[in-house]
């Protein structure tokens, strides 16, 4: 009797264990079918807001609550929007401002200057950048245009008159050849492109024949060769070429070791005797 009782109890326990396992399996399968699981549900749970519970229409600005209708979040600070109905609100560091009336320059808020048609930033300062303005922003500083020079431009930290000057290496330089000449820079100097050339940082004379540079010099390629940065006459050779700083005729001569010129001898190596 005891033996049968033990067998019965084991059967009941085994049935319960199997039933629990089956129920748990069915429950997990059902949750997976619906697209969630205990782990997934835990991952999808939203983190608490850093500024606590929000009312409808509220947003978080760092740890502060604010109403985006009346405020802007400026650098983690709720700032009151400009009151004007036509304002174009913007942030300047932690403050809100109206873009129609102010400019934010290097986190500094400044009003538009009076009678300014095209306000702009020059470092932390506001200036009038319009064509007819009397000011220029040069290297981060506001400079006044010279009197009577409405088309003045910047040259480094100074202004210059492009009608009479050129800007060479950050400095205003008078135009070579006068105001009506076309001048360019050759290093820190200006030169007249109609009568001069810039050859390797040196201003050389230009003519109808001297139209090319050879080192720091101008030369006539029809009558001279440029050898090692210096012009040398072709000496009437039919096929002239350079051998170092020497000019030779390739039809009758040979250049040996890049510095010696010898006559070509039939059936002999002209450079052999130089060894």
Curated annotation (Swiss-Prot):
Question: In terms of domain of life, where is this protein from?
Answer: Eukaryota
A Pfam family that this protein carries is Galaxin_repeat
User: What is the first-listed, main subcellular location in coarse terms?
Assistant: secreted
Q: Which InterPro entries match?
A: Galaxin-like, Galaxin_dom
Q: According to its record, what are the GO cellular component terms?
A: extracellular region
Locations listed in the record: Secreted
In which tissues or organs does this protein occur? Answer: Component of the acid-insoluble and acid-soluble organic matrix of the aragonitic skeleton (at protein level).
Kindly provide the name given to this protein in its UniProt entry. Galaxin-2
